């Protein structure tokens, strides 16, 4: 599978890369989301308007450390996420007012078998090891 860059649903903007995906909740409601690919984020994040629109409910709460060292507690749920490069079921942080834009974190990338190349700013299929 070739690397996916311009022309393959990754949008670039001065050192920042985005990918468009579709999230689906447990009742089948869907939303199209433009995710910031954030290889520094563990979990993906959905804004409150999106997760409420697709009918997600909190399953548990987790503590997170932000880039500035601040700790926050956020609810976490799960949804189906489809990208042009693959799809699967993934945990997502349920964003609160004032939280970041939609983020695509490394747990989701690993679940989908993808890795982000920060130098070329493209998604590649992951080279999986079976050991």
Give the role of each language-model region.
Residues 1-131:
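Pepsin/retropepsin-fold aspartyl endopeptidases
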């Amino acid at each position: 599978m070739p690397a996916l860059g311009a022309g393959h649903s990754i949008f670039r903007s001065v050192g920042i890369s985005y990918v468009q995906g579709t999230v689906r909740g447990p009742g089948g409601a869907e939303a199209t989301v433009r995710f910031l690919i954030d290889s520094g984020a563990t979990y993906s994040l959905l804004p409150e308007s999106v997760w409420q629109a697709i009918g997600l409910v909190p399953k548990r709460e987790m503590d997170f450390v932000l880039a500035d060292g601040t700790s926050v507690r956020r609810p976490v749920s799960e949804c189906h996420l489809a990208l042009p490069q693959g799809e699967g079921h993934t945990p997502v942080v349920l964003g609160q007012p004032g939280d970041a834009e939609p983020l695509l974190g490394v747990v989701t990338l690993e679940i989908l078998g993808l890795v982000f190349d920060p130098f070329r700013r493209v998604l590649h299929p992951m080279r999986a090891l079976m050991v």
